[in-house]
Amino acid sequence: MRIRSCVAAAGVVAVLVTAAPTASAAPTVRFLGQTTLPHAWQFEGTTVGGLSGVDRDPATGEYVLISDDRSYTNPARFYTADLRLDGSGVHDVRITGAHALRHPDGGTYSSPPANDGRTVDPEEIRVDPVTGDYWWSQEGERPKTEGPVVVQPSIQRATRDGAYVDALPLPANYAYTADRGPRRNLALEAIAFSADGALVTSVVEGPLLQDGDEPTAERGALTRLTVQTRDGAVVRQHAYPLEPLFAEPEPGPWGPDTGVPAILADPKVPGRYYALERSWVPGADYKVRLFQVDIAGATDVRDQDVLADDVRPVRKKQLADLHDFPLPVIDNVEGLTWGPRLPSGERTLLLVSDDNFAAEEFTRFIALALR
């Protein structure tokens, strides 16, 4: 998402539905380090920027990064990269490949001014644990006014070089209609695979139009988290509680923006996730927090067109606020993936920020350890 800155297996499904995560203390998170890429770094004829999603291939250790460039600067694309993540931080980031994301007809995607129905808004990318293909999400286009073509959100599967394979059937309430579905630029971003690749979980970044207003400084809001099989069958859908805005927004042309840009499934505990919530408030800049999320006991809302007043949302525990770490500035952090385990046994997390292709913002890689 672009934000204006002011400076398979039925047995697996059954386990998910019936088993609650084992009660335990929330994990602790510590800061390992960070590094930044040069602004407007050029690679193979493209400008490296707008990195809104990241994943690590556990089979090779290679990373994949998706740009949210809507073909304004270069055709919609993703990159592969090598880097070293250890107990002292992130080192030696090296882009190794650039690949255009391909339309089903084999061509590249158009930019929105073309108004030809071939635009996309790439946000997240994941390595398929089963096939090694890339699955990527995009928000589509809900026009501000009547007339321009509506492009629906989607989760697509691509080969390792970006060729279209197919698309995951999505819940009906993920679709844009006149008065239903996701808000503009607050649609489908976060996606995650279960460890075995049998399940795909997605989160709508902000509340659906029919589910109420966006968060304010006084109250939060409810968006939706959906668990599906990899062929598209909906297993469950839950309300996800977004935090209130962390500050009162100053008046101006740009309103506040808050939501869930990334989520990871816990590889050991079915039904447990780690979610990023990123908020931008005019006059207060960014706040980025990491939450542990458990869906056990939450109401299944897949058949609720409008969320009921007595809905029981998923449970959250805040694990970290990036303001508590020695970062020079809090950026538009949108990407989240597992890194390698440390010798201490801690799991690592790699976060990446979207610089919006702006000179005053940064492409930053942040390493955390989770115990």
Question: For each predicted feature, which ranges?
Answer:
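Sequence/structural signature of beta-propeller domains
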Residues: 2-6, 24-371
